[in-house]
Amino acid sequence: MSKSHFLLCSIAVLLFLTGLSASAQVLSFNGKVIDKTGQPVIGAAVVNTSDRSVGTITDVDGTFTLAAAKGDILEISSLGYTTTKVTVGESGDITVILQEDSEFLSEAVVVGYGTIKKKDLTGAVASVSDKDLKDTPVANVGQALQGKVSGVYILDSGKPGDNVTMKIRGLGTINDSDPLVVIDGVPTDLGLTSLNTADIDRIDVLKDASATAIYGSRGANGVVMVTTKRGSNGDGKVSVNANWAIQNVTYIPEMLDAAGFAAYSNDMLSNAGLATNPAWSNPETLGKGTDWINEILHTGKMQNYTVSYSGGNEKARYYISGGFLDQKGIVKTVGYRRFTFQNNNDAQVLKWLKFSNNITFSADVKESGSYSISSAMNALPTQEVKNADGSWSGPEGTSYWYGDVRNPVGPLYTNSNKTNGYNFLGNISAEITFAKWLRFKSTFGYDAKMWFNDNISYAYDYKPSAVEETTRYQDSNKAFTYLWDNYFTFDHTFKGKHSLNVMAGTSAQWNDASGINATKAGFLFSNVHEFDNGTVNKSIGGASSDWAMMSFMARLNYSYDDRYLLTATMRRDGSSRFGPSHRWGNFPSASAAWRLSKENWFPKNILVNDIKLRAGYGVTGNDKIGSYAYIQTYNTGTYIFGDDIVTTLMAKSMANPSIHWEEVRQANIGLDLSMWQSRVNLSVDAYLKNTADMLVKAAIPITSGYEDTTTTYTNAGKVRNSGFEFTLNTINFDSTGDGFRWETSLTATWNRNKIVSLNSDTPLYQNETGGAYITMQKNGKPINVFYGYVADGIFQTHEEVDNHAFQENSTAPGDIRFKDLNNDGVINEEDRTIIGNPNPDWLFSMTNNFYFKGFDLTVFLQGVTGNEIFNAVGIGNEGMASAHNQTASVKYRWTGYGTSTSMPRAVYGDPNHNARISDRFVENGSYLRVKNITLGYTFPKTLLKKANIDSARIFLSCENALTLTNYSGFDPEVGINGIDWNIYPLSRTFSLGLNFNF
C-alpha cells in the first residue's frame, strides 16, 4: 500500500471513530424542575456550566430540553430557591427538586415593634440596604438616601454637620412635617448626621398610614426605621473602611469684576442725578479686582474611617465599631468632626430567655464659621482684601460710591462659632419565649443629648464701622428621653395555610429638657475671654420643658396560603402636650393584599412570576407643637409703681385647652409585579392623604392684653396631598460566562399639594424681606406659594409710562412695567398675586450598576421637575439700586430704547421699586443631577488568601458630578420653602475608598 493510501485510510478511520465518540457523548437532556410539594417551577434557569452560552428555562410544566454531554454539570436556579447542580449521566431524563431559599423567603422588613416578611407586606414600605449606602462619599446618612426611595423628598444643605430636610409624600402641614426617626426600635429626634453610615444594616421607610399607624400620634409624616448592624454566627471578623476625599464648589454665579462694577456704578448714579466716582471715570483701567467669593472658598477635605469587629455563636453575638470623620468645608473655617461608637449584643442566656442591647454614641464638633455668602456677593471688587499696612480693608468714603458691606474675609479669621455635641442612644431588652408561638419582649430605651454653643465676636476696627468690644455667647443644653416598651407576640400557622401574627402591648415615653445661656463683654484682657474676665453682663437666660406619652398598641397580620393577606393596627396615645379633655386619641389602620399569582386560575407562564394587589387606609396624628400650647404662658417684665421699678408677670399667650392632634387620614392602593424570572420587578402606589384639624396660629386682638397675639394655636386647617409613586428594578443583562451583569433601578414620584382650608379666608403670609412677604398660605392653593407682582416688560418710552397704570412718581423709561391685575389704574398691594410654586411635581432617579470580572461601575442620576425658586439673592444682586456688587447678568440692563425687555435700568435708590417682590425673581427650579459615579474593583480571593484577608475592595467615586439646571444661583436645592437666601454652596466630592475584611 502506498503511503498516500495509508494516510487517507488513517484519516478516514480517525474521523469515523471521532464521530462515533461524539455521537455517544452528546445527549438531548430532558428534565423537569419541581418544588418540594411537587409543583412545577416555571421559568427556572438551566445552564450548562461547561459552556455557559448553552442554557434554557423551564416551561409552564417545569420541563426543559438541553443539549449536554455525559459528565457535564447543569446549574438550575430560580428566585426564591437555592441553586442546585446536577451531573449528566447515561440517561437524559431527570427530575430536579429545588429547595426554598430560606434567606430570601425570610427577608424581613422592620415595621415597628417587629418585622414582617417582605413578600407579606400589605402597606407602602421601601427599603434601602447597606449595599446601597456603602459607596456614597457623604458624611450624612440622609444625603446617602437622596433619590433612593420613591415618595421621599430630601434636600441637602451642603453644610458640614447639618441635617438634611426630609419629607415623605408631600407637605402635610404648615407646621413641623419631618418624619419620625426610629433607631433600633427607639423613637428619637437624633439627627441622621450623628450616625455612621458604615454601622447601618438597613433603612426601612414607612410611607402609608397602614404602615405608620403603629406609631399613632407621631406617624403622620412617615416613619424612617434605621437598623444598625449586628453580629452573626462565626469567628470574629474585622472590617475596615477608609475614605479620603476632596471637595470643590459645584457652581459659582458670575459677578461683575472691578471694571464692570465701575461701569455699573457710573450708570446707576448718573440715572439718579448723583455724582460719579472720579476714580472710576475709565472703568477698563481697573481690571478684574477682587473676587470675594473665591476669597472665602477653598478646596475642602474629608477623611472617614470605620473599624468594626463582629462575630458570635448560637449563644451570643456581638458587633462593635468605632468611627472618625473629619470634614473641612469648602467655605474657609467651616468644618465638622465626629467620633462614633456602636455596640450591639445578643445573648441567649437560657433556652427561653434572650437579652439584647444597642448602643449608639457620637461626639461631634461643628465649626460653623462667621462666613457670609451675601457679604461676599455684595462686597465691591474694587476693594482689596487688606490695606497696605496689613489691616483688613473696608469701604470708606461716600456711601453711594463704596457702599457699606463689611469685609467678608476678616470675620473668618477673627471670630469663632463652635458647637460641641454629645449623643447617646441606647436600649436593653429582654425577650421571653413561652412557647414557639408566644413571646414577650420588654425594652428600656434611653436617649441623651447634650450640646454646647460657644460664639466669640472679637472687637475690630475695619470699615465701615468698628465694634469696640469683644462679646462672647455661650449656652448649655441637655435633653433626656426615656422609653419603656412591653409587648407580646403571637405567631403561629394553622393547618399549613392560615398564618397569624398578633402583637399587643404598651409604650411609655417621657422627656425633660433644659438650657441656659449668657452673653458677656468688657473683657479686661484681650487674649483671655473666660466669663470671669468679662465685666459687662449683656444677657442671661434659660428655659426648660418636659412632655410624656402613654400608648397602647396592637397589630394583626393574617395570611391564607400566601394568597390573601390582611394587616390591622390600632394605637391609642395619651399626650401631655394637650389639655386634659383632649389628651387621648385613637389611630386605627387596615390594609389587605391579594396575590393573584397564587390563584389556580392564574396563567402559569414565564412572563409573570408574581403579582400582588394592595390596598390600605389608616389614621395617624401629628403632635409637634411644643409642650405648653394648651395653657396660658407668662413672661417676666417690669412695671413702674411710683418711683420703684417692680418685676412683674405678664401674660404672654392665650390658653386654648381644646387643641388636639393634627389628624391625617390616608388611603393607598398598590401593585407589586415580578416578571421574567424576577428580572423585572415593579412596585406602584397611589395615595390620597388628607390632613384635618391642622394646628394653625390664630391672631387675637392686640387689645386682649396678651404680649404675643400671633402664637395661639387652634385646630382649623386642612391640607390634601395626592400622588403616585413607582419603583422599577431590572436585570438588563446577566451573562454568567463572562461575568457581565447590568442592573437598573428607576424611581419616580408625582405629588400634588393643596391647602383645603385655614382658620379663615384671610391668607397667612410668611418669609419677610424688605418689609414684604414672599410666601402665602391660602385656601385652595399649595403650601408656601410665592406671592408678589407680575412684571410685564420694560417701559421703553415716556408715552408708555403715561399710558399705563400709575406706579410711582419717578417711574421712567427703563423701569419695569407691572401688571394692573384689578384694573383700578394704580399699581398697589391689590395687584399682588400668586407668582410661583416651590413644590415639585416630579421626583425621579435612575441607577445603573455594571459588574464585570471584579469591576463594578455605578451611575446614579437624580432630579426634580415642576418646582420654582424665589431668588431672594437677586433682590440685592440684580436690583441695581445700591453700591453692592451685582451678578454679571446686569451687563444686559436697559440703557436706552430697545436695549432690553427684561432687565431694567440701574438707578440708585430704585424709585420705581423694580426690585419689589415679583415674578422677575422666580426661576425654574428643575434639575437633573449626576448624583454619583463610582468605579470599584474587588480583589480576587485567591490573591487575598495568602494575606489572610477575606475580601478587599478599592473604589473611586464622584458625588454631585454634574448638574443640569436653568437656575442662576449656586444650586437649585435651596430649602423646602423654595427661597434662596444665599445658601451654603453644594460641593462636588472626589473620593478614594478602601474596604477590607479579615
Short names for language-model regions:
Residues 239-287, 714, 733-838:
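Conserved small-residue
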Residues 23, 133, 178, 300-303, ...:
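Extracellular/periplasmic, surface-exposed regions of secreted and cell-surface proteins
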Residues 271-288, 302-306, 373-409, 414-416:
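Acidic, glycine-rich flexible loop segments
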Residues 142-146, 711-720, 764-786, 835-847, ...:
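C-terminal extracellular loops and terminal segments
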Residues 280-281, 293, 464, 575, ...:
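Extracytoplasmic gating/loop element in the C-terminal half of outer-membrane beta-barrel translocons
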Residues 838-870:
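Glycine-rich, aromatic-lined ligand/substrate-binding cores of catalytic
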Residues 1-342, 347-349, 354-362, 425, ...:
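Short, small/polar-rich motifs associated with maturation and membrane association
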